[in-house]
Regions:
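A conserved acidic beta->alpha catalytic loop
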Residues: 24, 40-50, 95
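Glycine-rich, basic loop-to-helix element that forms the pyrophosphate-binding segment
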Residues: 68-86
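Short, well-formed alpha-helical segments that are part of the catalytic scaffolds
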Residues: 14-27
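Conserved nucleotide-sugar donor-binding catalytic segment
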Residues: 147-228
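Short beta-strand/loop segment that forms part of the nucleotide-sugar
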Residues: 33-42, 63-68, 96
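Short, flexible, basic/aromatic active-site loop/helix in glycosyltransferases
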Residues: 69, 124, 138-159
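Conserved donor NDP-sugar-binding/catalytic core segment of glycosyltransferases
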Residues: 103-137
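Short aromatic/hydrophobic "clamp" motif used to bind/position activated sugar donors
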Residues: 91
Length: 263
């Protein structure tokens, strides 16, 4: 693996916002050796032309790849192709409607260079949503823990809730931990990675990683209405199926309290 960082952006029909995303990458990727792979999952709304445009105008930064299979599949295929194409030591992900913050990649890669015992570096993030009046509101989401050495601590610290995009991973480990096509595929990916590759480090000194845009996402209101019970049930079932020897269980005490334990 060569020194550097690869950012993978899966793209499908995001013509309204993809320029904002790519401009944030162009302006904020920092000084660490860097490459951004845009994997287009057969867009039909003009997003493809924008991806090609940035590839041509900024060939030292962007690589545009289009999957042609006559119909959108899922982000899983696009992300996995980006992983397979990555040749740098570190890798990360950004959704096509989110934005990259200045300093995040340099900060994460430098930390992992200096602390090779950790497999992942994560930050808090900024969440941008539309309120009931249609106005854009921003809040930050951060976490109280730094070093995480075991899986239960990871869950209690909320490390699985930090957007998987707000993290820097080691590429050679990610290549052995591809995305699978199931519910909460991003959380499943991150939990599997953490389970296999502890310890990880959460830098709670800043939320400057990504801007998680949800003013474009019509499904977000539906997603936040799902109960914790149903989400945890589906996630744990998937982990048991995909991780041989997975030895953790959970039990709800009431609507707000869940007990996690090792079997």
């Amino acid at each position: 693996m060569e020194k550097g960082f690869t950012l993978v952006i899966p793209l499908y029909n995001k013509v309204k916002c993809i320029r904002y995303t790519l401009d944030s990458v162009l302006n904020n990727h920092g000084s660490y050796p860097f490459r951004c792979i845009i994997v287009d999952d057969d867009s039909t709304d003009g997003s493809s032309e924008i991806g090609e445009e940035y590839d041509v105008k900024y060939p030292d930064v962007f690589q545009y790849v289009k999957i042609k299979h006559h119909g959108h599949k899922t982000p899983v295929n696009a992300r996995n192709l980006g992983i397979k194409l990555a040749e740098t030591e570190y890798i990360g992900f950004l959704d096509a409607d989110d934005e990259l913050c200045a300093g995040f990649i340099d900060r994460g890669c430098t930390f992992l260079d200096e602390h090779p015992e950790y497999s992942m570096y994560g930050n808090g993030l900024t969440l941008r949503v539309l309120d009931e009046n249609g106005e854009i509101k921003e809040t930050t989401r951060n976490y109280s823990t730094n070093k995480i050495n075991n899986f239960i601590d990871c869950l209690f610290a909320g490390a699985q809730d930090i957007s998987f995009c707000a993290s820097v991973y080691k590429t050679e480990l990610v290549k052995d931990n591809l995305f699978t096509d199931n519910f909460c595929e991003d959380s499943i990916f991150k939990l599997k990675y953490i389970y296999k590759n502890l310890p990880i480090y959460i830098d709670n000194s800043t939320c400057e990683s990504i801007v998680w845009n949800r003013q474009y996402n019509e499904s977000y209101k539906w997603n936040v209405k799902r109960t914790n019970d149903s989400i945890i049930k589906e996630v744990f079932l998937t982990l048991k199926n995909e991780l041989p020897g997975f030895k953790y269980e959970y039990e709800f005490i009431n609507d707000e309290t869940v007990v996690l334990y090792e079997t």
